[in-house]
Amino acid sequence: MKDTSTSQLAGKFLLEEIQARGLTQKELARRMGRPLNVINEIINGRKAITAETALQLEEVMPEIPARFWLNLETDFQLTKALVNKQTQKASSVREK
């Protein structure tokens, strides 16, 4: 289990959706009223999808509800927490 897999999936999904609509990251950023670097960081899995971002994405792509975007982010955070927990367990076992 990789801690970036879900985040990368969300970013890849977002990129595929904007490309399917003939948009660029720059145009998406403009429509959302967000800086381009924020969109790029989300697409590359380095920035979280917040509730505000999810609502903005829903405004630009109304057929994809904000809840969907938030669920992707929640899944990523849970995956990351599980990986951290497993890493901590493995470290404590090695120390014994």
PLM region spans:
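DNA major-groove recognition helix of helix-turn-helix
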Residues: 18, 43, 53, 61, ...
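Short polybasic/polar patches that bind polyanions
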Residues: 19, 30, 59
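DNA major-groove recognition helix of helix-turn-helix/homeodomain DNA-binding modules
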Residues: 52-68
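Extended catalytic-interface subdomain
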Residues: 95-96
